[in-house]
A protein has these predicted regions:
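Extended aliphatic helical segments
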Residues: 28, 35, 71, 133, ...
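Redox cofactor-anchoring modules in respiratory/redox and cofactor-processing assemblies
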Residues: 1-131
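Cysteine-cluster motifs in flexible loop/terminal segments that predominantly coordinate metals
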Residues: 44, 142-145
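Iron-sulfur cluster-binding cysteine motifs and their immediate structural context
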Residues: 49-59, 97, 144-164, 181-199
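Ferredoxin-like iron-sulfur electron-transfer modules
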Residues: 33-41, 81-84, 119-141, 155-178, ...
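Short pre-active-site segment immediately N-terminal to redox-active cysteine/selenocysteine motifs
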Residues: 43-46, 91, 138, 174-175, ...
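Poly-acidic low-complexity segments
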Residues: 26-27, 72, 135, 144, ...
């Protein structure tokens, strides 16, 4: 790849990043994608409010998306403060627009953000907060999920004519990467995405 091609690849337009980010249903994943793509391309790093703010925003968003220890409302307040500082202090429009995007995303649904602070991703896109499980009532034991899984996360035996006593299909959570390939090939939609933390338990606190 030529040097010219590398420069073109790096200089991704902010408009394209925004468009791709907005394809994500989860607000946290939307903001995280935008920030990571901005860091990887358009950010020049010439002013501190933008460069340091974007790195800090990424750390805070990862904390929220993974529901790391002690994550709380202070992370949201920090992100809003970072966004404001980027709008005020960034030298270029790119930094200011990134700050605006962070604030707009976080304030578009406080309920969804608060659910993340409780360990729940309502859109089921934060992979650390979800699990893939096989519904035995819908599973026809065709074995397609087993064949497509690259991580040996699925165990079970494919149904064969005139035989009985099968090992039911199951997803081993420690091996599962939540890539979603098994969901795509399942003909009966037997693979369900669930939150690892029950919403009713959170709301009752």
């Amino acid at each position: 790849m030529s040097e010219e091609s590398l420069i073109e690849e790096k200089e991704k337009k902010l408009e394209d990043i925004r468009k791709e980010a907005e394809e994500k249903a989860c607000l946290v994943q939307r903001a995280l994608y935008y920030v990571e793509e901005f860091l990887a391309g358009p950010m020049c790093g010439r002013c501190y409010p933008c460069s340091l703010g974007t790195y800090e925003a990424r750390i805070r968003l990862i904390r929220i998306s993974q529901h790391l220890e002690n994550v709380n409302d202070s992370d949201i307040k920090a992100l809003k403060r970072i966004g404001s500082k980027m709008i005020e202090g960034s030298f270029c429009k790119k930094g200011k627009d990134t700050g605006k995007f962070i604030i707009e995303t976080l304030t578009s649904s406080e309920e969804e953000i608060n659910q993340h602070l409780s360990g729940i991703c309502p859109k089921k896109e934060c992979i650390n907060l979800i699990e893939y499980v096989i519904n035995p009532e819908l599973c026809i034991m065709c074995g397609k999920c087993l064949e497509v899984c690259k991580y040996d996360a699925i165990i079970g035996e494919k149904r064969e004519p005139y035989l009985s006593g099968y090992l039911p299909f199951e997803i081993r959570q420690k091996r599962c990467t939540r890539c979603g390939e098994c969901v795509k090939v399942c003909p009966t939609e037997a693979i369900e995405v669930i939150t690892t933390k029950k919403e009713e338990l959170v709301s009752s606190k």
